Amino acid sequence: MIQQKVLFISLVAVTLGLGLGLGLKESVQPQVSCRYRCNETFSKMASGCSCDDKCTERQACCSDYEDTCVLPTQSWSCSKLRCGEKRIANVLCSCSDDCLEKKDCCTDYKSICKGETSWLKDKCASSGATQCPAGFEQSPLILFSMDGFRAGYLENWDSLMPNINKLKTCGTHAKYMRAVYPTKTFVNHYTIATGLYPESHGIIDNNIYDVNLNLNFSLSSSTARNPAWWGGQPIWHTATYQGLKAATYFWPGSEVKINGSYPTIFKNYNKSIPFEARVTEVLKWLDLPKAKRPDFLTLYIEEPDTTGHKYGPVSGEIIKALQMADRTLGMLMEGLKQRNLHNCVNLILLADHGMEEISCDRLEYMANYFNNVDFFMYEGPAPRIRSKNVPKDFYTFDSEGIVKNLTCRKPKQYFKAYLSKDLPKRLHYANNIRIDKVNLMVDQQWMAVRDKKFTRCKGGTHGYDNEFKSMQAIFLAHGPGFNEKNEVTSFENIEVYNLMCDLLKLKPAPNNGTHGSLNHLLKNPFYTPSPAKEQSSPLSCPFGPVPSPDVSGCKCSSITELEKVNQRLNLNNQAKTESEAHNLPYGRPQVLQNHSKYCLLHQAKYISAYSQDILMPLWSSYTIYRSTSTSVPPSASDCLRLDVRIPAAQSQTCSNYQPDLTITPGFLYPPNFNSSNFEQYDALITSNIVPMFKGFTRLWNYFHTTLIPKYARERNGLNVISGPIFDYNYDGHFDSYDTIKQHVNNTKIPIPTHYFVVLTSCENQINTPLNCLGPLKVLSFILPHRPDNSESCADTSPENLWVEERIQIHTARVRDVELLTGLNFYSGLKQPLPETLQLKTFLPIFVNPVN
């Protein structure tokens, strides 16, 4: 056996010796793959295929050269093939084993190469999870804008956008966010950044003329970088002024030296930069050392706006654009998760406006209204008209004549012409010299243009009335600062600035938002609003005798027992308490104007606050119930008398209303809301009248005799508060008494510019306004007080054809009413103040969608 083994070993040795002696060599396998070989130096001695950057010229590349060496320089994601790749020059992102250390991994590296689940497949984060990695004491805030992403896209096609849909499901989202008017890109982005209306921050459109600067502003002009255009304090400055750092990857205004400075980091706008590169840069900012890392970051992409303009809002192309936007969000969230920041960063995803379909068949031409279109016109969905010879003719241009010539010219017009001061107050679009005096409010899907030379009428556009559903924008939020799985009612984008300040623990600069109104979005609200403090308390107006002699010029022949009728106004304390419980169920409106002299007047069915400064009520409040009757009885005719509680020198008189004047006395509380003729006398008094243009009384009377009873039936009763507004300088705030007294129209009675009506009911319509324990519903209106009804082309039309449509155009927030009157509503509500602020900032919507 041993001999056999020795023989075998000897044979092997001989064989090897012979092989070596004959020069046999070990076989070399030719190269067949580029894995780990990309960009290697070419060698003629190498066998097999090549992977150098010239191999395509020699037609000598390995079969996987394209996938292994070329695609990584064009791709923003990993693949199984790329995992563990050798480092390649000029790749967009890396999938090499050391990419985490080098901080240049593709955002999906861990999920593709390390087997971790993707952010999209993860469950929604629990509030108890550890949120931030070491070094992040405060959650960064990312503000991400997807231009032109209308809320309806997400409503209709959410299943095609899994990343956005997950953000919606896991975080907080609004049904929609309301843009400011005009619903344009620069306008709304800068409003979001400052919390200011366009009239306040100055960017009133994408194209502007300023007579004081004698300059034109446009998106493409160099003058857009002139800081003189940009007012207010954008959020990036608020952050840096208070010790934080801010970085903006494109945002209107961020590349302008506003107030002498820029954001800590900013990028000059360049639309050619891929969305993925923008996300990658934002993630790199979050990788910076703590001393350099921004606390606030913005990110902007042009889609789906660009595609919406080209193809319209309902198209296969828009779906592709939405999916591109969705992938961009997914890339951001994957990158955040890879850094363990996905539950640390607070992210707000929103849009500036929506998108509407347009057609060249839906154009209103000014050439059809003027023989000579001798003016300058900003054409489109939000047109403005001014003199073409500026600055010379800027102030002398006949704006009123233009509006008159565009009013009620055709049986069907697809726009309404307004002087800026007459625009609906909800738009807040008057108080800036840059807002031209002539404005056209255009119907949905229509545009107003000069003449038939206009050709930009295909696809989609935006700029329309911000109440149009097509102009509504998305709002979604996610992160440790926000409530989870939370849907909230709509709100306006002026509120976002305060919200961002709260997330960053900053003190906001003055703005048009209502701080605290979005506290219900936040897990732990940073700011607690305080109740308003009344500045002027009511005085006493004691019951007194009828003045003798009575020089008021008032008469009421139907009253036979004047003393008995007047005694009805002399309520004892118990009767006053009962009246307040009935007529002021949510508390008395508080007066926030300084040095206002007024007294409370109690009647059984209504209460008013009579002002000795303006000789009329500041407000009148009453509650009406659901009635099966569809009409109210007529008021007693030719019956008006002095209120014996008001001294004659502080009272209106009937002689103030001469027949040759255009004004007539109107009633804040309708006398015929009382159940009997005798009770009507409680309201047929001078303390209940206000001056109204005769044309306006048609609207006012129909509103009260027909529409308010209708709404009371629909809502199981209403509390009604109404009163005058004085805003002669159209700044959206109440005028001083000195200003008011300059507008008395040949009488000592000042003439209001508007009247307000606030209708409050119980959201649960089982309950009446008086026994409502839950949330309230509100309809509020600010009605322009105009001498005629040309706004509705209604001088000869019956009221049922136009009044309701008119008041709906002039819907408003309760907060708008407060600012214009100096009043504070709902002071008696027991609910938390942020809930009351939600009610005050709610804007009813009546606009019907286009069929």
From Swiss-Prot:
Disulfide bridges in this chain: C34-C38, C34-C51, C38-C69, C49-C51, C49-C62, C55-C61, C62-C69, C78-C83, C78-C95, C83-C113, C93-C95, C93-C106, C99-C105, C106-C113, C124-C170, C132-C344, C360-C457, C408-C793, C541-C599, C554-C654, C556-C639, C762-C772
Binding note for cofactor: Binds 2 divalent metal cations per subunit.
GO cellular component: extracellular region
Active-site residues, record numbering mapped to chain: T185 (amp-threonine intermediate)
Record CDD domains: Enpp, NUC
Residues bearing attached sugar chains per UniProt: N39, N216, N259, N270, N405, N512, N594, N674, N745
Pfam families reported in the protein's UniProt record: Endonuclease_NS, Phosphodiest, Somatomedin_B
A GO molecular-function descriptor: toxin activity
Known EC number: 3.6.1.-
Cofactor dependency: a divalent metal cation
Binding site for a divalent metal cation 2: D147, T185, D352, H353
Reactions the enzyme catalyzes: ADP + H2O = AMP + phosphate + H(+)
Reported tissue expression: Expressed by venom gland.
Binding locations of a divalent metal cation 1: D305, H309, H462
Secretion signal, residue range per the UniProt entry: 1-23
InterPro entries: Alkaline_phosphatase_core_sf, DNA/RNA_non-sp_Endonuclease_sf, Endo_G_ENPP1-like_dom, ENPP1-3/EXOG-like_nuc-like, His-Me_finger_sf, Phosphodiest/P_Trfase, Somatomedin_B-like_dom_sf, Somatomedin_B_dom
Main location: secreted
Cellular compartment(s): Secreted
Family, as annotated: Belongs to the nucleotide pyrophosphatase/phosphodiesterase family.
Designated name of the protein: Venom phosphodiesterase 1
Species for this entry: Crotalus adamanteus
